A protein has these predicted regions:
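Condensing-enzyme catalytic core mediating Claisen C-C bond formation in acyl metabolism
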Residues: 1-50, 149-214, 218-221, 252-271, ...
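Short, well-ordered amphipathic alpha-helical segments that serve as non-catalytic structural scaffolds
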Residues: 55-71, 119, 203-218, 285-290
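Acidic, glycine-rich active-site loops and adjacent beta-strand->loop/helix elements
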Residues: 83-88, 110-111, 135-144, 187-189, ...
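Short glycine/threonine-rich loop-to-helix capping motif typified by GTGT followed
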Residues: 93-96, 234-249, 314-321
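Cofactor- and metal-binding active-site motifs of prokaryotic enzymes
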Residues: 95-102, 121, 141-159, 316-319
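Active-site-proximal alpha-helical scaffold in enzymes
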Residues: 106-134, 172, 277-298
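Internal helix-turn-beta structural module
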Residues: 282-283, 289-320
Length: 333
């Protein structure tokens, strides 16, 4: 691997995304991408007594499904990078505690899936034959931790987003047919002073812009190089902000840009306000939809930029601003 510019790594032997899996909740199952997910749940509990246990089960079963589909024995997977939104990443650690694979828990808020793929790609090129990457989120457990108990029935402002209930997992390998992770661009923390916890899109968009521009400068590429430029969960408001900010900086991304939070729900038929969010948003949309687009040869080059708001309930209550982060990976056939 070699360093390009300030924040980008180019892989000499690009790691392969061998196989993926995705499981989503009932609201996502009623969205426009439902047919692309491996499994759609009928309710948020999935036979468990708590939402937290349900989320742990979701990531556990998603990981097992990805391993099974890949044809790689779990004994041959050398590292697992996984994370979620709950305190101490309990969904990942509890869900994967019986996996018997070296576990590296990570937290990047909603950027966690691409953060995991980035770290997994580095270690795959460096020394490992197979690596597992996963992320999850759950609407009910996230609302309980970050906002208000669902029983209160609080009204949600139009700028708020709906945390995706779901998990996505990917098995990376040293060799295979592709798609390949050719570059990663790790993001910097960007804080523009946004304090509204119900407008995460506005808080994260500047970080997405910073990483996007850095990627283009480091690689010498233009937006037109990619068939699709996809952000993780900026939602409708954040997507519009990023498009305008990029245009102001001389980058026209209107023709090939979309956001996972915009794609996963139907704006007219589902009441999700500004769209989807959460670790599971980017993870399920990539693992469910975009991976199949690669396999069907409908796209050949994808820039996936997962965005995260590095905040919690305490800092919001104390009036702190919301730092944003965005990590990007270039995936190509």
């Amino acid at each position: 691997m070699q360093k390009l510019g300030k924040q980008t790594i180019k892989f000499d032997t690009p790691p392969v995304i061998t196989e993926v899996a995705s499981i989503v909740g009932p609201k996502e199952a009623n969205g426009p991408l439902a047919k692309y997910f491996d499994q759609c749940l009928e309710d948020e509990f999935w036979g468990e007594k708590t939402w937290e246990k349900s989320e742990s089960k979701i990531i556990k079963e998603t990981v097992n499904m990805a391993i099974s589909k890949s044809g790689v024995s779990s004994n041959d997977i050398e590292y697992c990078f996984a994370g979620d939104l709950l305190n101490q990443c309990i969904s990942s650690s509890f869900g994967l505690r019986e996996l018997n694979i070296p576990f590296i828990g990570i937290f990047g808020a909603c950027s966690t899936f691409v953060e995991g793929l980035s770290l997994g790609a580095i270690i795959t090129e460096a020394c490992a034959k197979h690596v597992l990457c996963a992320a999850s989120s759950h609407f009910c457990s996230a609302e309980k931790q970050f906002r208000f108990p669902l029983e209160l029935g609080n009204q949600r402002p139009p700028s708020s987003q709906w945390t995706v209930t779901g998990s996505g997992a990917a098995v990376l390998s040293k060799s295979g047919e592709g798609p390949f992770i050719t570059h990663i661009t790790s993001g910097k923390i960007v804080d523009m002073g946004i304090k509204d916890a119900n407008n995460m899109g506005a808080a994260m968009a500047p970080a997405a812009l910073d990483t996007l521009i850095c990627h283009f400068k480091d690689t010498g590429r233009a937006p037109s190089y990619y068939d699709a430029i996809i952000t993780g969960d900026l939602g409708y408001i954040g997507k519009e902000i990023l498009t305008e900010l990029a245009q102001d900086k001389g980058y026209n991304i209107k023709s090939n840009y979309n956001d996972c939070g915009v794609m996963i729900f139907d704006k007219e038929l589902q009441d999700t306000h500004s769209g989807g969010s959460g670790c599971g948003c980017c993870a399920t949309v990539f693992s469910g939809y975009f991976f199949k687009q690669f396999k069907d040869k409908k796209i050949k080059r994808l820039l996936l930029i997962a965005t995260g708001a590095l905040t919690n309930a305490t800092t919001s209550q104390q009036g702190e601003s919301i730092p944003g982060i965005a990590h990007a990976i270039s995936i190509e056939m």
